[in-house]
């Protein structure tokens, strides 16, 4: 029972986040993709990219001035193709 209370309080805390809806949309998309496609060996196409970008942008805006923005910078360093795609989209 203690776990349920802790889980509920964590859920309540995250729902007050300005990015909570975007986070939920991304997680729902990812979980659906993982369970319906990835597990079956169908991972050719990048899915949930739009949801991830919206969530990442929201985090970036809301974490400005905090050391947590480093997480988003590391994501770019670990995914250089994503940086190239983001650059192409911003220049269009």
Swiss-Prot record:
Pfam families: UPF0203. Residues 16-66 form the CHCH domain. Residues 1-21 are annotated as: Disordered. Keywords: Disulfide bond. Disulfide bonds join 19-58, 29-48. Residues 1-10 have a biased composition (Basic and acidic residues). Belongs to the TRIAP1/MDM35 family. This is Uncharacterized protein At4g33100.
